[in-house]
Every structure is written in C-alpha cells, then in structure tokens.
Amino acid sequence: MTLFPIFADLTGRRVLVVGGGAVAVRKTQALLQAGAEVVVGAPRLDPALAALAEQGGIARLDGGFEPAWLAGAWLVVAATDDRAVNAAVSEAARARRVFCNVVDDAELSSFQVPSVVDRSPLIVAISSSGVAPVLARRLRERIESLFDHSLGQLAALAARYRPRIRAARPDLGQRRRFYDWLLDGPVAARLRQQQPGLAEQELEQALRAPQAAPRGSVVLVGAGPGDPGLLTLKALRALNEADIILYDRLVSEGVLALARRDAERVPVGKLPGEDHDATQARIHALMLAQARAGRRVVRLKGGDAFIFGRGGEELEYLRAHDVPYEVVPGITAALACAAYAGIPLTHRDHAQSVRMVTAHCRADQDTLDWAGLARDQQTLAFYMGVGQLDYVTARLLEHGRAPATPFALIENGSRPEQRVVTGTLAELPEIARRRSVRPPALLVIGEVAALADTLQWFGQHQHGLPGPQALAA
C-alpha cells in the first residue's frame, strides 16, 4: 500500500485552490460540500467561480500564484493547465508542509483525491494510487449501482439509535445479529420506500422485543425480457441481497448469473399443459413459508411482474398473510422486444396509441374487444400468442383490420438468438408455420411493424414466406 487512506475534517478550515477553470470549479464545489473555507487564486475565474466570489461563498485572490497564498491553508489543490505553475505550487506547499494535490499529476502530489461514493454519513473512497484513474471511476460506478441512496439515511438512523441498541443487546453476538437485521430487514426496506416514520416504528418494535424471530420479506422483481443489461439497478441489488430466488421459466441464465452466489435458486415456472392455478398456489405457499422462516425472498419474473405476470395476485396473497413486500418493476417484453427489433411502438405517422394484449385465452372465454383492436392508427402487442395465431388473425380480419396490415413476430427478443419474422396479417399464421416460430415470441401488429424491415439493428431478420431454396433446405 503506497498511499495511506485518510478522511479529512475540513469544516471551517482554509483550503487553497489555484486555478480558475472548469477543473477548479469541480474541486471548489466538492470542497464547499465538505464545509471547507475555500480560497481560489487565479488571474481569471470561470463564471461559476466568479458568481460564488460575488455571493461570498469563496474568497478570491487575483493574479498569478504566489507562495504567500499558502498562509493558513490546511490543504492546497493545484488545478491549472500549466505544469510549471502546478510544480511551483507543489514545491511551495512541500516547503511549508502543507499537503498538495495537483490534479491528474501523481508525481507532484502529496495527497490524491479519490473517486467517491457518497451516501453520507457513509462515504466510500476508491483510489488507484494515480496509476489508473479510469479504473477507479469504473469501480465507483459499480459500487454506486449496488448501494441504494437510502443507505445514508439507514446509517444515520443506526448512529442515532446506537446507545439504545447497545443497551438492548449487551451481548456482542446478539448485537451483530441485530445490526444484520437492521441492514437487511424491514427497516431498510421502509427507507427504500421513502417511509422513514414507519422505518423508525419497525426499529422501536424490534428493540422492545429482544428475542423476536427474524422477519422475512418478499421482493417481486421484474427480470426484463432476457438481456441482463436491461436489469434495473434495484433489481440487481435485490438479487445480491436474496437468500432464495423463486424464478420463472423465461428468466434468462444471464440474469440469474448476476445473483448472489450462495442464494438458493428454485425454478417455479409454469409448463404448457399443467394446471397453472395449482402451480400458482404452490408458489404462494413457498413464498409464505420462506418469508416466515426469516429469509429474504426474491420472486423473479420475466418482463414486468404486473404485465400479464400474475404479480397482483401474489401481492394480494402476501398482504393477506402479513408478509412485508416490495416491487421492483422490469422492462416488459413489448417495450424491449420492439426496441431490439427497431419497431417504435408509437409513431406520429402511423400509431397514436399502444395496446398490450394477452392472447393466452380460450375462444369460449374470450372477452377481448376485437372491434376496438381492429381499428387502425394503433399498435397491438400480443403476449403469449404463438399458439393462438390462427384465432387472433381470424378475429382481427373478421372485425375489419386490413389484410395488408404489417406484423412482426419477435422470437427470443433481446437475447443472442433473437429472430424477427415480418409479413402481412393475412399471411401471419402461414408465415409463422413456415418459419417455425416458437415461444417465447411477441407479436406486434400495426403499420409500425413494417419499420423492422429497415430499422432492425439486433439479431436475425426474415421477411415473408421462405423461398423455394429455404424450403428445400
């Protein structure tokens, strides 16, 4: 370790910034946030610094650098674009035993400013010892994605209750377990939900019940359509905090690979032909049992849990059984598959509305408004429609949708094996059969679907019926 990490209390202490440009602006703003009394010296100041000086936010020294500027300074930052000036600042600071940072010049610096993840009062600092600043920045971005912004509130709450926690849990082992519960349990969840009052109530109740059993919770997470890059930061955090993950059949391996390594993974996806209601009842029972055992449960569903995912039913069940829960939205298939196929779901010239429809219904239970669906100037996105293409096509044509209306079938949308098959509504069932389209696939119907022929940027694209050579193959 070539650098000793240290956090400096600069409140009310004089810090000199030499330089008046954009870099000096950034350094000055960071120092002011830390409570420093900042003095900026330069021949000219950036408008932002000039405004701060006029408002009394900083002190100003005009002209070129002079060693006398260092009088009374605890730290100095050299932020000019002239290395000779920066070297002079560094030498003068060294002679006076004042720590000096020369921006982007480790050789001239006696201290370095790290990349920072700020969840005050919790602060994470990352340094590459000046060797690879880009690497430090990348690491900071990764850490930023892992820690919710409510973490600072949680740290402040823990600090405020520290004496009471110590009194209520005098045994060190008990106290550690309590802090684990505090960081991972319902208090942290309430803060993430912007409910600080309820968070404090949870903490008060726990302190009044010294030996209370750990209380589990369920996070309903939308996994998106398959590309792990489309997972939200909150979803990633939930996967990294999970004790057990109950995942659906369409959740991709790439998404599961991002989960905590020691989390238990249980597939609960429904298979074609089985009793889906019975399977759903088993999922409900499993969520309840795991949460009551004090575990952090992630219910991981493809796409978004509230778009044809029975997420509402699962939340109703959890609420009825007094299980704490959260919901993390996911990118639903209609949005992601269309985007990866180059299809804008709305377009000023072609579609002023979008309708998301489930095609997973039997003819004797069909309550869809087919007359409304058959109107033009709208985009239809049919979920779970591969097995119902003949029925969907017949109903739309019967209610007046034009036979020449474009369609796009997006198979395995957003995944490496994505394939887009396009054509016209009249030929939809035949094209799908001849092209051997298989689930999972999203069906898009409307004028915008034709844009896939020119705008698709990802995966394979096949238009219309296969030619004789393809059929022979």
UniProtKB/Swiss-Prot annotation:
Pathway where this protein functions: Cofactor biosynthesis; adenosylcobalamin biosynthesis; precorrin-2 from uroporphyrinogen III: step 1/1; Cofactor biosynthesis; adenosylcobalamin biosynthesis; sirohydrochlorin from precorrin-2: step 1/1; Porphyrin-containing compound metabolism; siroheme biosynthesis; precorrin-2 from uroporphyrinogen III: step 1/1; Porphyrin-containing compound metabolism; siroheme biosynthesis; siroheme from sirohydrochlorin: step 1/1
Supply one GO BP term: siroheme biosynthetic process
The annotated active site, in chain numbering, is 248 (proton acceptor), 270 (proton donor)
Q: Which Gene Ontology molecular-function terms are recorded?
A: NAD binding; precorrin-2 dehydrogenase activity; sirohydrochlorin ferrochelatase activity; uroporphyrin-III C-methyltransferase activity
This enzyme catalyses:
uroporphyrinogen III + 2 S-adenosyl-L-methionine = precorrin-2 + 2 S-adenosyl-L-homocysteine + H(+); precorrin-2 + NAD(+) = sirohydrochlorin + NADH + 2 H(+); siroheme + 2 H(+) = sirohydrochlorin + Fe(2+)
Q: What is its EC number?
A: 2.1.1.107, 1.3.1.76, 4.99.1.4
Region called Uroporphyrinogen-III C-methyltransferase, residue ranges: 216-473
Residue numbers bearing the Phosphoserine modification: 128
Q: Where is this region: Precorrin-2 dehydrogenase /sirohydrochlorin ferrochelatase?
A: 1-203
Q: Indicate which residues the UniProt annotation says bind NAD(+).
A: 22-23, 43-44
Where on this chain does S-adenosyl-L-methionine bind? 225, 302-304, 307, 332-333, 384, 413
Q: Which CDD domains match?
A: SUMT (cd11642)
Q: Which Gene3D superfamilies match?
A: Cobalt-precorrin-4 Transmethylase, Domain 1, Methyltransferase, Cobalt-precorrin-4 Transmethylase, Domain 2, NAD(P)-binding Rossmann-like Domain, Sirohaem synthase, dimerisation domain, Siroheme synthase, domain 2
Keywords carried by this UniProt record? Cobalamin biosynthesis, Lyase, Methyltransferase, Multifunctional enzyme, NAD, Oxidoreductase, Phosphoprotein, Porphyrin biosynthesis, S-adenosyl-L-methionine, Transferase
The protein's role, per its UniProt record = Then it catalyzes the NAD-dependent ring dehydrogenation of precorrin-2 to yield sirohydrochlorin. Finally, it catalyzes the ferrochelation of sirohydrochlorin to yield siroheme.
Show the PANTHER family listed in the entry. SIROHEME SYNTHASE, SIROHEME SYNTHASE-RELATED
UniProt family annotation: In the N-terminal section; belongs to the precorrin-2 dehydrogenase / sirohydrochlorin ferrochelatase family. In the C-terminal section; belongs to the precorrin methyltransferase family.
Could you tell me which HAMAP family the record lists for this protein? Siroheme_synth
Q: What is this protein called?
A: Siroheme synthase
Q: What species is this protein from? A: Bordetella parapertussis (strain 12822 / ATCC BAA-587 / NCTC 13253)
Q: Species lineage, top-down?
A: Bacteria, Pseudomonadati, Pseudomonadota, Betaproteobacteria, Burkholderiales
